[in-house]
Amino acid sequence: MPGSKIFSLEGKGLKLDTAEDIEPHIKELRDNADVEEVRFLGNTLGIGASEALAKVLETKKKLQVANFADIFTGRLLSEIPTALSHLLTSLLTLPNLYTVNLSDNAFGLNTQAPLVDFLSKHVPLRHLILNNNGLGPAAGVLVADALTALAEKKDAARKDGQDVPYLETIICGRNRLENGSMAAWAKAYAAHTGIKEVKMVQNGIRQEGITHLLTNGLSHSAKLETLDLQDNTFTATGAKALSNVVGGWADLKELGVGDCLLSRRGGISLAAALAKGKNPKLEVLRLQFNEINSKGVAGLADAHTKLPALRRVELNGNQFDEDDAGLAKLRDALEERKDAADGKGEDDEEYWGIDELEDLESEDEDEEEDDDEAKKGSDDEDEGVEVEEKAARELLAAEQAEQQNVPQEKDKKVDDLADALAKTQIK
């Protein structure tokens, strides 16, 4: 009788330190040759337990999905790299493992090495989920560099006649990637041309970094279906870059740029870009809290005829009145589409129409955007990002040098102490 295709210890809150601790919990997994998905999220694994689990995992050649989110809560920084290395080294032996979730684990500079090694080598990878890992820009550079190296390995394998999947999904939010890692991420996206889903929310990326990411990286993602960059900072500069590249995403279904400070000018620019009719599959627009005014809303209302699949637009927190004419036009158009959809999505309040407009602001007629910012040249923006990337790499080099020097300094102190003791005579 075949075993279950899913093995799960999800959310059990187990504290598994040693091989002996974990053995009773993975006996069923050990005996299951047909398992395709494992879920260990919500438990905490020590070095011994991770090593024992790794030995079992490397025998599961049918495994496709590994969920190791939140598996190091309460662990010392000195434990995590070794434990993680055991697990990820075993995953490298699995030819069908295409989805890996490592969210909610601390992978800063001190613990990133096993992750970076795995990402640079695991050719079968299709879907990578790295949310809330505390990377920071320096470790973010390393992760992006690893993905660029992975693209090279995938290409080399294809040239050897192997059937190799494209990397399709990167979810890397709440990681403080900032501007300092955007040049590296742009290179990674440019290398992985099969990307379909990108979610990089809440990363502290400013307009220069956003512009670089879009212009030099995601502009190469012709197969992109979902882009979520919410809660980063665009301003008119980033909105202009988005407007310039969005037409290249003919398969785009969902665009999330809420809480990104697109600005009034940016809202108008994006609406004009969408009105060109190059995004026929676009279904969802998330544009909340962006200072979009009535002109921007009017632009979206006019653009809807060029967006035949559009069903949901989120506009709360922007700068127009609830009785705005453009808003009414857009709402009516979406309502007509809902009526024509024969009940599709009717059980989901957020599937159709406009979101709840509870936090609208009045448009400030005296507010003037900085024209100089909107007219900044791309050369200046690229230079700024390159400077910040250099700083991130210098921080990384300094951190690595410090880690290498610590043992040497300790050894020197031990030697000095030994010399002093050797000179001491008992009287």
What role is predicted for each listed range?
Residues 1-427:
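Leucine-rich tandem repeat or coiled-coil scaffolds
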